[in-house]
Amino acid sequence: MKQSKLLIPTLREMPSDAQVISHALMVRAGYVRQVSAGIYAYLPLANRTIEKFKTIMREEFEKIGAVEMLAPALLTADLWRESGRYETYGEDLYKLKNRDNSDFILGPTHEETFTTLVRDAVKSYKQLPLNLYQIQSKYRDEKRPRNGLLRTREFIMKDGYSFHHNYEDLDVTYEDYRQAYEAIFTRAGLDFKGIIGDGGAMGGKDSQEFMAVTPARTDLDRWVVLDKSIASMDDIPKEVLEDIKAELAAWMISGEDTIAYSTESSYAANLEMATNEYKPSSKVAAEDALAEVETPHCKTIDEVAAFLSVDETQTIKTLLFVADNEPVVALLVGNDHINTVKLKNYLAADFLEPASEEEARAFFGAGFGSLGPVNLAQGSRIVADRKVQNLTNAVAGANKDGFHVTGVNPGRDFQAEYVDIREVKEGEMSPDGHGVLQFARGIEVGHIFKLGTRYSDSMGATILDENGRTVPIVMGCYGIGVSRILSAVIEQHARLFVNKTPKGDYRYAWGINFPKELAPFDVHLITVNVKDQVAQDLTAKLEADLMAKGYDVLTDDRNERVGSKFSDSDLIGLPIRVTVGKKAAEGIVEIKIKATGDSIEVNAENLIETLEILTKEH
């Protein structure tokens, strides 16, 4: 395909509003353009990459018996009222009315639609299982769209739904999807982890997230590609090397979530769901009597601990939440942080939010900084982290402004429900006892759920089982963020390309190093001088030969300076560059492997054979 015929509006500079490198490069390299806040047009290069990813998905889903279909994006609100999500989904839901004043939504997800279709068509267990999916645009009214394609108001998603007559059958399909997702993301060239995830608004019971890991850009060997003009990093002057490190560090590490993973086992979880190895300890110290002490101007745990000369681990942090309009007291060891997802899941609450100062004062009789679990009203619900029960003679708020209580002992002075509600910390033991926890940032690219009967119960999707009984259909849900795959791949495969000019100056610029499976084209064929007829003829022959061998070829036939052509080539990021230059009359061309910066001159007649060898090596 001729580059002059494509819409590839590259920019000379990085866009000033981009915070993450994937957003900056997608815009600068001419892959996408923003139409309005959170809404993007996918230009030809991006569309080709997305279509290649769709092909990978379709091939892997065919192996597990998943069947593609297409549901409408414009949905009647009545379906969402059936499931209860019309009122509870929140402000992200696009709501609109037609000319008859009927309520509609733009679908952010399609559980209700697929459930209705199957409910109306399937009456017996003999018609199950069904495994359906679609690839379609979704809509969420994000309050603050950001980071390019990672947080948008319109996005492309693959959502699949499976329907079963029992949980054992669901387990089989769930495992099929887990393996299919691993195959898809591996083929796409992603460094990813399958982690324990939270079902969130989807209502799932068991779930697994697939996170593209976005590591810090500190490893020069990974993030920097040297031109053939530079033998090694050791040849780069120290001051230039420092500039390169600063450029790498200047771009924010993307990733909406933190992953906690074991250094020695397969354990990995979203920080919201991560836990650690817990060993209850026996109390050895004698229990002191309660004593009220004045703690003037002490509002925080560290201030109280310093004032009373105790360690923060000997204090109790007391928080008040409102869960489905009911007050819940949450307790933590003083130096720990609350994990609201764990608390919300334990309470099985639809809504959970921190109480206001006024609500806290009405419940405890004191303001923030002086709250505690002792002498609360009869029937108060207290949920404490499991570490709290190990405390002896702890310090807690006295429910009296400016005062705390010492000698607080769980069990004697208050009763609580003990459960893991804390946020884990790096360096703690993995819950499986193997290795310690480390953190990494990640971009969620896929999520699978065991929905169970969440939607079939609320929407009356039932079948007759083998015994003639009416039972709810058991469901699974499987999503992949198709458009955000482009961001995830670029985040992992962006590179800083460094070269040395004939004058001895060092130059560096960002570009993309696309994995072969997702690159919009396989080969970038560049004619240095389009006015040289010999070079033009050789380019045309090479283009035909490459295409005949199955290569997707982007031919740069533009009448531009060679420097601009090479700069655009680095930005666009195709795996192989073939340059027809000054030696065209001799039948000599240059091959450059984008991933390594290595280049070699070959006879044009040997180009295909050489490429086959080089692509196997890389």
From Swiss-Prot:
GO terms for cellular component: cytosol. Its EC number is 6.1.1.15. It is found in: Cytoplasm. Pfam families: HGTP_anticodon, tRNA-synt_2b, tRNA_edit. The keyword Aminoacyl-tRNA synthetase applies. Signal peptide: none annotated. InterPro entries: aa-tRNA-synt_IIb (IPR002314), aa-tRNA-synth_II (IPR006195), aa-tRNA-synth_II/BPL/LPL (IPR045864), Anticodon-bd (IPR004154), Anticodon-bd_dom_sf (IPR036621), Pro-tRNA-ligase_IIa (IPR002316), Pro-tRNA-synth_IIa_bac-type (IPR004500), Pro-tRNA-Synthase_IIa_type1 (IPR023717). GO terms for molecular function: aminoacyl-tRNA deacylase activity; ATP binding; catalytic activity, acting on a protein; proline-tRNA ligase activity; transferase activity. Keywords: Aminoacyl-tRNA synthetase, ATP-binding, Cytoplasm, Ligase, Nucleotide-binding, Protein biosynthesis. It catalyses: tRNA(Pro) + L-proline + ATP = L-prolyl-tRNA(Pro) + AMP + diphosphate. Its main location: cytoplasm. It is an enzyme of class 6 (ligase). The keyword Nucleotide-binding applies. GO terms for biological process: prolyl-tRNA aminoacylation. PANTHER family: MITOCHONDRIAL RIBOSOME PROTEIN L39/PROLYL-TRNA LIGASE FAMILY MEMBER (PTHR42753), PROLINE--TRNA LIGASE (PTHR42753:SF2). Catalyzes the attachment of proline to tRNA(Pro) in a two-step reaction: proline is first activated by ATP to form Pro-AMP and then transferred to the acceptor end of tRNA(Pro). As ProRS can inadvertently accommodate and process non-cognate amino acids such as alanine and cysteine, to avoid such errors it has two additional distinct editing activities against alanine. One activity is designated as 'pretransfer' editing and involves the tRNA(Pro)-independent hydrolysis of activated Ala-AMP. Homodimer. Consists of three domains: the N-terminal catalytic domain, the editing domain and the C-terminal anticodon-binding domain. Belongs to the class-II aminoacyl-tRNA synthetase family. ProS type 1 subfamily. This is Proline--tRNA ligase.
